[in-house]
Structure formats: C-alpha cells, structure tokens
C-alpha cells in the first residue's frame, strides 16, 4: 500500500513538470497521464486465459461466422428431420390405413361404417402423423436451448429481424416452418412481445413446408421441361428453389406490412442474458418434447378431427339422389363393364366425388377460379386439400380415376397432360401449372395449422384474418402469374 501511495504521489507531482504558460500544456498533460495509466494498469489488472466456452462464443456471435455456423446447424437439423421422420410417419400412415380397412371390413355396411373408416380414423391419423416431425424438431430446439446456443442465435439475428417488425427469437419459428408450420407456430411462445409473436405466427405458414413438396414436384414435372441452364443447373430444381424463395420473400414483406398495420403501445425490446454454454439436461429435453406433443394432440387434434369428419361428409354425400343415379349410369357404361375391379372402384369414386357436395362446390367456384386457368376438377382439389396440402395429389388421383398405386404418379401425370378443356386446349399448361404452384406458395391450405394458430392466439379472429389475407395474396399472385405466362 505504501508503494501505491508513492506511485500516486509521483503521478500527481509529475504534473508540475509542465509549464502552464505553454500553449500545448493541456494536450501534453493528457498524453502524459495516458502513458502513465497504461504503465500502471498491468499491476492492477489480472488477465485470465480464455475458457473453451468463451472461445466458442467468439464463433457463435461473430458477425460473419456466427451466421454461417447457424446455417450449418439448421442444415444438420433438417437433414435429420427429413431423413428420420419419414420412417415413423410412413408407419403411422400405413397403420391408420390398415385400421380404416379393418373397420370397413368388420363393421356392418352403412353410414356408421363410412363415418368411422373414412372420417374418424383418417382424422385421428391426420393428427398422429405430425408427431414424428414435431417430436424431432422440438428435441433439437430443446437441446439448443439447454446448451445455451439458442440465446446466441437470437442475439445475432435480432439486428436483421427487428426492422421487419420481428424479433431475434422469430428466426427459430420461421426456420422450423420450412419443415412444418405446426411446430413453427407452437415455438413462438418464446417471444414475449405480443405484436412480434403475432406477426411471426401470421407469416409462419408462408414459409414453404414439406407438405407442399408433393404438389410442387407433380406440377413441375408436368409443366416445366427437363433441361439445364449453363450446362449444370437443373431447370426443374431452379423452379423449386424459386418457389421456396418466393415464400420467404413473401413472408418478410408481409411481416413489414403487418408491422405498420397492427398497433401495439408496448415496444419490443430484446432483453437477453447469455447463459453459460453447458451440456444439456436430457430429462428437461424429454419433458419439453412430451409437453409439446401433448399440447398438439389434445388441443389442435380436436379441431383437426372435427374438420376431417366435415370434409368426409361433404365428399361422401350429395344433394338428393344425384350420386346414386350417376353411379348407376356409370355402371351401365361399356368402359365400366370392361374394366377390372380396381378400375371399377376408381370410376365409381370419381363419379361420386364429382356429384358430392364438394364436387358441386367445385363447380360453383369454377367461375371464380377460371381466370387463374383452373377448372372445377382443380377446384375440388383446392377445397379438399384444405385438410392438408398433400391431399391435392390424392384428390386428383380420385378425380381422374387413377387406380394403380404402383404407377400412380406416372399415370396421373400422363392423364393430367392429356386433359382437355371444353374448347379442346390443354388444361395443364405452363401458365396454369405455374399459377397453381404460386397459389400453393401463398394459400393457407392446412387445417392443422389453422387449429394450432387458433390454439396459440386463443381466438378465431386471427386464424380467419390469416386465411383471408393469405387467400387474397394467393389469388392475386396466381392471377398475375397466369396473365404474364399466357
């Protein structure tokens, strides 16, 4: 302590060296003191070596490498989701198909049989089939959160998301929605500001999810010619990439517009404490996954099941005895009599669907969708695919009476390619095909997501608004696409 006092005394007395009459007195004094402080500082400051976790933070929050590392993490996560979720999803799908067939064979023929085998069981299956994706996604998100890395991601993304009316925490739900909007919407609970969370929920379905892939691949193969740009870039792959990019741009622009429309006095502030990096507590990870699955099954599942039964009823019944009469007429046709049992069943299903309530609704909306290049058959697919976007392909298979499951996609593509309008022109052209793809980029064609949005917002107001503005966007951009390419 005596040594420090002597140092301080010398430091003060050293100021007396300077002549106050000197015009540069103050500058010299400041420079001298700065040098003196720099000389004395090492004796007061204790330097410690960087810990391994601190070295990792230099990477995680780096202005450039932090973003690249995050993209790599996302790539690994979605590779796992797409690679491994498909196996249990296929098993769940085949199990519920078996249960539907078992119920159909075991129960007496009639309304109850059809309700259970074609409405209730497929509806429950429509809930359970999403569980593998939800479980895997929240498993990885829980790990990222438990380790402390997720807080770093939120920190680096906030500067990009905030001008759009979003929050750094919005990045996880939006990226999650590229796999499935359902877990994406559910993961917005980490966003504390109501306005930012609501905007994230409203734009999440605009991110192209995996359910859109069957629609995209069928239509791209149908209307986009095979070939390469610059000798190595696949044209069909380029169109697929463009559709994903269109969805992302649409989501971000919509977020900015909603930021200006939705009023909220509370300003969004990102208050974030970066926790220490650590190994995850697996018990907490498992609890998080189970909790998310439970919320989805018991809350959203009830609504999904109800809508499934409604869609089944509308597709199975029609006004008066039109279905019965049309079925009898087709059974008398020469084509029907010469067909195999599978072909006969497909033809009857096609005629029943055409004259059902949904078929009549498809014909009713035909004048509205005709400017987009669609006919009533596409209208039926648009309506039925509200249950889930991937239902689009199955609906077309039923409408066009494609019966051989082993070659379903090839036969469906060939049948659609040969489909003609009343004036003899092809139904599926580059203009109508691209218009349909753009429609699916923006349209809210997923009742499961609607159910989850209702659950998360605690109101039907926002799901209805979401369906409305996404429907308007889908119609407007599909119309623009058709007019440009016609």
PLM feature spans:
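Alpha-helical transmembrane helix bundles of large polytopic membrane transport and channel proteins
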Residues: 1-47, 330-336, 341, 407-418
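Core alpha-helical transmembrane segments of integral membrane proteins
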Residues: 60-155
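Extended, low-charge hydrophobic alpha-helical regions
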Residues: 88-120, 124, 164, 185-198, ...
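Transmembrane helix-loop junctions at the membrane interface of multipass transporters and ion channels
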Residues: 213-239, 294, 448-459, 478-486
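Long hydrophobic segments that form regular secondary structure
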Residues: 259-268, 277-329
């Amino acid at each position: 302590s005596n040594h420090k006092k002597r140092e301080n005394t010398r430091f003060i007395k050293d100021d007396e060296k300077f002549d106050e009459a000197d015009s540069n007195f103050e500058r010299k004094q400041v420079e001298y003191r700065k040098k003196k402080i720099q000389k004395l500082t090492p004796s007061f400051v204790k330097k410690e070596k960087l810990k391994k976790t601190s070295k990792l933070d230099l990477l995680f929050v780096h202005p450039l490498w932090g973003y690249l590392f995050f993209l790599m993490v996302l790539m690994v996560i979605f590779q796992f989701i797409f690679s491994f979720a498909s196996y249990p999803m296929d098993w769940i799908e085949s199990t519920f198909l078996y249960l539907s067939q078992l119920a159909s064979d075991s129960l007496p023929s009639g309304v109850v049989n059809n309700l259970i085998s074609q409405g209730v069981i497929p509806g429950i299956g429509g809930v359970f089939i999403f569980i593998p994706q939800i479980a895997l996604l929240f498993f990885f998100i829980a790990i990222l959160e438990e380790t402390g890395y997720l807080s770093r991601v939120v920190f680096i993304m906030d500067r990009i998301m905030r001008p759009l009316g979003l929050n750094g925490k919005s990045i996880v739900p939006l990226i999650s929605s590229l796999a499935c909007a359902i877990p994406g919407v559910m993961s917005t609970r980490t966003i504390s500001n109501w306005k930012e969370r609501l905007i994230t929920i409203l734009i999440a379905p605009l991110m192209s999810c995996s359910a859109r892939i069957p629609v995209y691949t069928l239509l791209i193969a149908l209307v986009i010619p095979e070939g390469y740009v610059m000798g190595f870039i696949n044209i069909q792959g380029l169109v697929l990439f463009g559709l994903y990019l269109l969805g992302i741009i649409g989501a971000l622009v919509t977020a900015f517009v909603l930021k200006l429309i939705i009023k909220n006095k509370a300003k969004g502030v990102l208050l974030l404490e970066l926790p220490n990096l650590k190994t995850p507590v697996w018990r907490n990870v498992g609890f998080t996954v189970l909790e998310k699955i439970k919320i989805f099954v018991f809350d959203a599942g009830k609504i999904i099941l109800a809508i499934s039964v409604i869609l089944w009823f509308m597709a199975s019944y029609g006004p008066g005895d039109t279905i019965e009469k049309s079925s009898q007429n087709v059974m008398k046709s020469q084509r029907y009599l010469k067909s195999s049992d599978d072909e006969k069943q497909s033809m009857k299903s096609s005629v029943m669907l055409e004259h059902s309530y949904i078929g009549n609704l498809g014909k009713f909306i035909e004048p509205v969708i005709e400017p987009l290049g669609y006919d009533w058959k596409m209208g039926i697919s648009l309506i039925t695919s509200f249950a889930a976007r991937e239902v689009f392909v199955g609906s077309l298979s039923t409408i066009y009476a494609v019966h051989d499951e082993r070659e379903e996609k090839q036969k469906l593509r060939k049948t659609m390619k040969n489909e003609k309008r009343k004036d003899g022109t092809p139904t599926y052209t580059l203009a109508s095909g691209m218009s349909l793809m753009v429609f699916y980029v923006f349209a809210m064609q997923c009742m499961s997501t609607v159910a989850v949005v209702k659950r998360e917002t605690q109101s039907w107001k926002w799901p209805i608004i979401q369906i409305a503005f996404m429907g308007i966007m889908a119609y407007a951009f599909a119309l623009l696409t058709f007019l440009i390419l016609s």
